């Protein structure tokens, strides 16, 4: 009985092999035809792609880098939105400074005509080599963005802001004229046009956006962003930034505490939250971010108001501890290295808690060592 079934099985397997061979041949023919018509690289197997992992740009805040899965993704569209004076422009200026430090070229399309070069320079931006455009119309701004992207010579383009991209028809019209949906149509057309070029050139484009309130909304969130829905769909990352606290020394205000929620992320888990300090005239407090994560991962321990490192008290209160980190750069480097090591240990966490990587690292540090367990056993 079993011997009679073997020839039938062999015949079936030969048929399957022949069929798969024909399909593979047809596939290679059609791929070759597409490449001849549209150029090399117009279609490929994903495993053959030269860059599988998405490269990132640091945001300037270690906590936000972790929430984003490394930083801003290169070659993608990013939207940063929030209320006034929440830190939107500061975030993008730090990204520009990071790009320039690594030898890249950045451009700032200042549709609001509000860029402060002195403040930008204080954040580390090389204002001498920063490309700046102050366009008259929304069409002009987006055409400039498209040409910069297609040049493949620019690594980062910042548009400040979508709300200020006024269509030509509105500028040439009179006050009070209704131009319903003109800005949304402009943004939709621009997104369709520039998205393909962004992927090819590897240029990152950050759009800053403002908030508006929907009229007549009783339930749910009445807030929305300007420029229609196109940017929401085309953006790989959307960041919602809010001011949650004003930092004071006595009666003097010296900064704000910002909270960023990753509202959308196509390259890492979304809905993570990061907090950091923005100091007036100085930008994001990198040492403040480091201290927060060192506390989360138990590299630096806190008892009451005192912070201690390796059993020694290093500062009473957060401000004094940050000052100690400034005055001891060697210890700061060691603490930063230890924090990153612990975060790497706990990087497989899947929960979207406030600081998931840090909380996982804390669990990893409290877990007993297997060698110690076996020795004690």
From Swiss-Prot:
User: What organism is listed for this UniProt entry?
Assistant: Prochlorococcus marinus (strain NATL2A)
Q: Where in the cell is it found?
A: Cytoplasm
What are the record keywords, sorted? ATP-binding, Cytoplasm, DNA damage, DNA recombination, DNA repair, DNA-binding, Nucleotide-binding, SOS response
Task: Look up keyword S-adenosyl-L-methionine and say if it applies.
Answer: no
Which cellular component terms (GO) are annotated to the entry? cytosol
The family annotation for this protein states: Belongs to the RecA family.
What gene name is given for the protein in this entry? recA
Q: Please give the function described in this protein's UniProt entry.
A: Can catalyze the hydrolysis of ATP in the presence of single-stranded DNA, the ATP-dependent uptake of single-stranded DNA by duplex DNA, and the ATP-dependent hybridization of homologous single-stranded DNAs. It interacts with LexA causing its activation and leading to its autocatalytic cleavage.
Q: Where does ATP bind?
A: 82-89
Provide the protein name: Protein RecA
């Amino acid at each position: 009985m079993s011997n009679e079934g073997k020839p039938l099985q062999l015949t079936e397997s030969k048929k399957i092999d022949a069929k798969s061979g024909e399909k593979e041949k047809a596939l290679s023919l059609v791929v070759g035809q597409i490449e001849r018509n549209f150029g090399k690289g117009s279609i490929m197997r994903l495993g053959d792609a030269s860059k599988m992992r998405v490269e990132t740009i640091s945001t300037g805040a270690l906590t936000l880098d972790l929430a984003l899965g490394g930083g801003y993704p290169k070659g993608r569209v990013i939207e940063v939105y929030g209320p006034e004076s929440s830190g939107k422009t500061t975030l993008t200026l730090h990204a520009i400074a990071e790009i320039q430090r690594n030898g890249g070229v950045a451009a700032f399309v200042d549709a609001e005509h509000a860029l402060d070069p002195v403040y930008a320079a204080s954040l580390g931006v090389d204002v001498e080599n920063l490309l700046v455009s102050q366009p008259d119309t929304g069409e002009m701004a987006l055409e400039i963005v498209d040409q910069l992207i297609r040049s493949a010579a620019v690594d980062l383009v910042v548009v400040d802001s979508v709300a200020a991209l006024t269509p030509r028809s509105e500028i040439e019209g009179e006050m009070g004229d209704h131009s319903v949906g003109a800005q949304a149509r402009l943004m939709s057309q621009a997104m369709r046009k520039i998205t393909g070029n962004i992927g090819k050139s590897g240029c990152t484009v950050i759009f800053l956006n403002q908030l508006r309130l929907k009229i007549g909304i009783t339930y749910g969130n009445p807030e929305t962003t300007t420029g229609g829905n196109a940017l929401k769909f085309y953006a790989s990352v959307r960041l919602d930034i809010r001011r949650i606290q004003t930092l004071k020394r006595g009666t003097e205000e010296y900064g704000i505490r910002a909270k960023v929620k990753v509202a959308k992320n196509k390259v890492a888990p979304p809905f993570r939250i990061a907090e950091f300090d923005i100091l007036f005239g100085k930008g994001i407090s990198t040492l403040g971010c480091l201290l927060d994560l060192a506390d989360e991962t138990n590299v630096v321990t806190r008892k009451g108001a005192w912070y201690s490192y390796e059993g020694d008290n290093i500062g009473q209160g957060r401000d004094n501890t940050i000052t100690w980190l400034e005055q001891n750069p060697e210890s700061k480097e060691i603490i930063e290295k230890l924090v990153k090591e612990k975060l790497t240990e706990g990087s497989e966490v899947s929960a979207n808690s406030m600081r998931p990587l840090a909380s996982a690292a804390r669990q990893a540090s409290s877990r007993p060592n297997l060698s110690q367990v076996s020795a004690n056993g």
